[in-house]
Design a protein with these regions (language model features):
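Acidic/histidine-rich catalytic neighborhood of metal-dependent amide-processing enzymes
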Residues: 1-26
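Metal-dependent amide/peptide-bond hydrolase catalytic core
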Residues: 28-171
């Protein structure tokens, strides 16, 4: 077992020392409705319309900012309804993925909290609104054929350029 004091990651940087990077999380949003024939939409609850409202409200949230790393961006990267394709059907389910760029000090709880608070507010305002937020789960196959899985949450990191480690590299 090796326990190194330091690690250097050889990533494209134009030979510049990078002392930090935003992390990344994939947030899974789900909205739930009630299927109906699209000729009688009043008999259903359109999960896509509920998702549109949720995304519109999420866009109003102010992401945290780090002096060196920038904004903790949150952007919709995909959206799909069910049934899909939904010929003549009011969709009863909708799923969207958010790409959330993470800053140092952010935790799983602190990232999901504002999203869950927003969902709770929308559910209170609209009795037909039903949604949940969680982290996407990634599944990967190892060289041994074993399958591993975990939440897609990769923290940001930052080292002060004045730290000994960085000064030794620059020296």
């Amino acid at each position: 077992l090796v326990n190194p004091d330091y690690v250097v990651i050889g990533e494209a940087s134009g030979l510049n020392i990078k002392t930090g990077q935003r992390g990344r999380a994939e947030i899974l949003l789900e909205t739930f409705g009630k299927a109906a024939h699209s000729a009688n939409p009043e008999k259903g609850v359109n999960a896509v319309k509920k998702m549109c409202r949720l995304i519109s409200e999420l866009d109003k949230l102010q992401p945290p900012v780090h002096e060196q790393l920038g904004k903790g961006i949150m952007e919709v990267t995909d959206i799909i309804s069910s049934p899909y394709p939904g010929a003549s059907v009011v969709p009863e389910y909708c799923r969207a993925t958010l790409d959330r760029r993470l800053l140092t000090g952010e935790t799983k709880e602190s990232v999901l909290a504002p999203v869950k608070e927003l969902i709770a507010r929308l559910e209170k305002e609209d009795p037909q609104f039903s949604a949940k937020a969680s982290f996407s789960v990634g599944k990967e196959k190892c060289y041994t054929d074993a399958e591993i899985q975990g939440e897609r949450f990769f923290p940001g990191w930052y080292y002060d350029p004045k730290e000994d480690y960085i000064q030794k590299i620059l020296g």
